[in-house]
């Protein structure tokens, strides 16, 4: 039996964003539970699980899209961490953001670089902690 869209999406979300992605979905349960379900089913169950691009490529496209939209700090935070989770280097994330500069301008790129810096610093702090 084929997995449901929600099951496929939940697996993809966990693989990419770990606890951060689930925290976003959980934060919507009290006010807009359908929105959380749509994110899991559509974005992660239908789109992220398609053939043609691997998870690293999908995260780069997502980061570029979020940079162009502007005012997406929470989403950029989750997806930059997701990019690291699926094996992209910090340098690749920075290059993807810099690639947006000629098309969306310096203010949005600077803002995104600052989000990346915060995620990278947190990632470094987490990796310095002893593992249980």
Language model feature labels by segment:
Residues 1-56, 85, 109-132:
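Acidic, glycine/proline-rich low-complexity segments that act as flexible tails and inter-domain linkers
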Residues 12, 43, 78-79, 96:
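A general alpha-helix detector
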Residues 37-40, 70-76:
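Short acidic alpha-helix initiation/capping motifs at coil-to-helix transition points
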Residues 58-66, 96-97:
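Short, structured motif recognition centered on aromatic/hydrophobic residues
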Residues 65-72, 105:
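Short alpha-helix boundary/capping elements
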Residues 72-92, 108-119:
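Extended intrinsically disordered, low-complexity coil regions enriched in Ser, Thr, Gly, Ala
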Residues 101-107:
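C-terminal structural segments of small proteins and small subunits
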């Amino acid at each position: 039996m084929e997995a449901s869209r929600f099951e496929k999406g939940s697996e993809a979300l966990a693989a990419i964003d770990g606890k951060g992605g689930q925290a976003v979905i959980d934060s919507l349960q009290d006010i807009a539970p359908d929105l959380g379900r749509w994110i899991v089913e559509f974005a992660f169950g239908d789109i992220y699980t398609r053939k043609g691009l691997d998870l690293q490529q999908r995260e780069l496209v997502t980061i570029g899209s979020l940079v162009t939209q502007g005012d997406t700090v929470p989403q950029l935070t989750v997806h930059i961490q997701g990019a690291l989770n699926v094996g992209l280097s910090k340098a690749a994330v920075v290059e993807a953001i810099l690639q947006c500069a000629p098309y969306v301008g310096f203010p949005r790129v600077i803002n995104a670089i600052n989000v990346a810096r915060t995620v990278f610093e947190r990632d470094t702090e987490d990796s310095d902690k002893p593992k249980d």
